[in-house]
Amino acid sequence: MRTLKASGQWLDAYGLWVAQHKELVPLLYNGSFDDPFEADGFDWEFTAAPRSRAGVLLEQEAVARRGLVLDIEFTGRSFTSPIVRQYLFTPPGTYRVRGEYMASKLRSDEGLAWSVQCLSGSKAVAGRTAGLQDTGGVWKPFEFEFTVPPDCGPVASLQLEPAAALEATIGLKGHVAFDAFSLTRALPSQ
């Protein structure tokens, strides 16, 4: 699948992904972060760096009454953005992403943002959250809508990045965790 994705053969890659699962695959895979990450498919992806030089330490961590969550520790060093992403096979239309997050001692001027970006056509940002700031260790919900335009191509990227791109170069400090993600097609307004 890695080769198919790298060469832009998204339909073939996604077809192979679905065939391997032998069951209905949701629009957003592993949104609860409870399953181990599946490399090279349409699950969560991140760039691994040696622990001693990493600006981001990312793992799945067990949390009481939640199961596993996506746990991210910022070390103060620079890092590659996006921090984590999932390729979404989404036809044109409007969608809603919902999730929960908790941030503790997060030192960031503008916070973190989830965005959806087209991979072809204009490569436009289809939607983005406001900056997610420190919550003092309390879980809070977030949501945003995005619209996939017809020229977006078959795949878009849901990705986490600093709301201010410069902060990837400067580095961040603190801890953030994510859980309970869902992606649904938004109903037209009446």
Language-model-detected regions and their locations in the chain:
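Extracellular and organelle-lumenal recognition/adhesion modules and their flexible linkers in secreted
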Residues: 1-190
